[in-house]
Swiss-Prot record:
It comes from the Bacteria. Pathway: Sulfur metabolism; hydrogen sulfide biosynthesis; hydrogen sulfide from sulfite (NADPH route): step 1/1. Signal peptide: none annotated. It catalyses: hydrogen sulfide + 3 NADP(+) + 3 H2O = sulfite + 3 NADPH + 4 H(+). This is Sulfite reductase [NADPH] hemoprotein beta-component. It comes from Geobacillus kaustophilus (strain HTA426). GO terms for molecular function: 4 iron, 4 sulfur cluster binding; heme binding; metal ion binding; NADP binding; sulfite reductase (ferredoxin) activity; sulfite reductase (NADPH) activity.
Amino acid sequence: MAKVELKAPDGPPSDVERIKQESRYLRGTLAETMEDPLSAGIPDDDNRLMKFHGSYLQDDRDVRTERQKQKLEPTYQFMIRVRTPGGVATPEQWLVMDELARKYANGTLKLTTRQAFQLHGVLKWNVKKTMQAINGALMTTLAACGDVNRNVMCNPNPYQSEVHAEVYEWAKLISDHLLPRTRAYYEIWLDDEKVAGTPPVDGEEEPIYGPTYLPRKFKIGIAVPPSNDVDVFSQDIGFIAIVEDGKLAGFNVAIGGGMGMTHGDKTTYPQLAKVIGFCKPDQVVEVAEKIMTVQRDYGNRSSRKHARFKYTIDRLGLEAVKEEIERRLGWRLGEARPYHFEHSGDRYGWVEGVNGTWHFTLFVEGGRVKDYDDYKLMTGLREIAKVHTGDFRLTPNQNLIIANVTSEKKPEIEALIAKYGLTDGRRYTALRRNALACVALPTCGLAMAEAERYLPKLLDKIEEIIDENGLRDEEITIRMTGCPNGCARHVLAEIAFVGKAVGKYNMYLGAAFNGTRLGKLYRENIGEEEILRELRMLLSRYAKERLDGEHFGDFVIRAGIVKEVTDGTNFHD
């Protein structure tokens, strides 16, 4: 195939590119600065590199101003993210994470929207011990953050449960294949001996990434229709499993999704991935690699906010990018096969799997595993992990599946669920069961407003409106993020709130219930009083005027309340 004439955008490299180039494959001076006793933080250059190792330097923003008044440095702490491909963890791994959360972190575990674990509040002096314990449990934090391929997602509880093992295996293979090859991680955290001599020549240590890795983060997810729980179109690469006659026939390939944008900058926008073809299962790892290398070579390394793959595709053209992918593969993708998505939520409660096994999906509000005064969630899960013989699966909706429970073990697990009052969410409204929120304040440095701490309280008030209109069991997706970067995939929710300032949010409406359409800006910079007033009007109209089976996101478009977004490039129109 002839080489397509593509070019990377002009402009000087960003400072992050300099940091990566000079880092000697992610080493920087991390080994030294993490040992420096004079500060609980680390320099900015090393913090940029720290992300590749799976950690962010943060501080407690609740006390930041008071600390400044006292002329004290911020209360620095580290967030550590554990990559768990497909969200699968053993009971032994769960117990390790539980112990680390209580010993070194803030006493809680965060289940993320990318099926990973997060520990918050880890002090600098405890980071290395935490990293070593995580690796001792056969998990890793390498490439959980940074300009690399992140945690690979996959549906943890498909309707065709026999397909899960195969799809999960491919998710793991993709994840392993795209891990950075540098020894820096092992040297710094696991006391591996340093590589002798001078640093290797460019490309030798990173055969896929090269010395400057990717222009920006890169995300991959695998969906198994009819469930779109991974929000496959939000991914840089979305693989849609095609199951024929109960067997995995292959994957449709979608490219160029991404949720992030910048307030006030219309050159930034969310975008949905577009399907470009089909590949067989044994081709999926190669396809993922070749697609990622196109972004490596042609992505924007000058402007970080325009560096995601979605902008590369929109700049070069979908067909040109597809041709370049196929040129690198040396063969053409097949024709995309039919598929259908029904929803993007979880299947709560007990679901029967194959070979006499059962899966229990637990509702975990905000993905936060902790012991509350009246709800010992963390303790209950710890006790279950001690006797569980299957696995745990973190869902893309921040919930948890106690999976592969044998019929013999089920009564014991049921007894512990009952003892600790662990809930499948059925006592809550369908709206709350379909809610997502990012961490935001007080630890995220990018947050402009609350999300995880505020959404449950806002839902208490929205639920009064829901009940007034007889919509308690109506499935509506609602999501909140503290900034427009989109960690909770906000613009794929039928109702979305994006933090603009403390107590103020932009409100979006009209995304598809099954994650196949973006939402549209409806109101800007509004507070709680106006949010509730708008929702009272909207939900009242929906209850009275909806068609049979019509979802809320579809209704607001049909009723002319917001315009339909047909592509990310017209998101701001």
